[in-house]
């Protein structure tokens, strides 16, 4: 899974759960680290607004999800903006390389397609 600092909120939680289920490597750079959410944005008389944290995520074991740090990758690949400006995404290229390596070493089997459901 590709991750970087633009991944936040669910983009922090999903890679964490992906890792805990050992579904594959996390490739890229650390996620943003923001999982305390807001609900509603009251407007102020000067047309500004204010937000107040109102909820937070926790793990399935009942512990709080680590706020403020993000999820570290298994394979660190920093973004290269100069390469990206030339059309090369070094994080994506590394992920493709890793996936090809995993397919070669572990194989790949297409899961069966379920039959169509009957809706009445």
Residue ranges and their predicted role:
Residues 1-120:
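C-terminal "post-core" interaction segments
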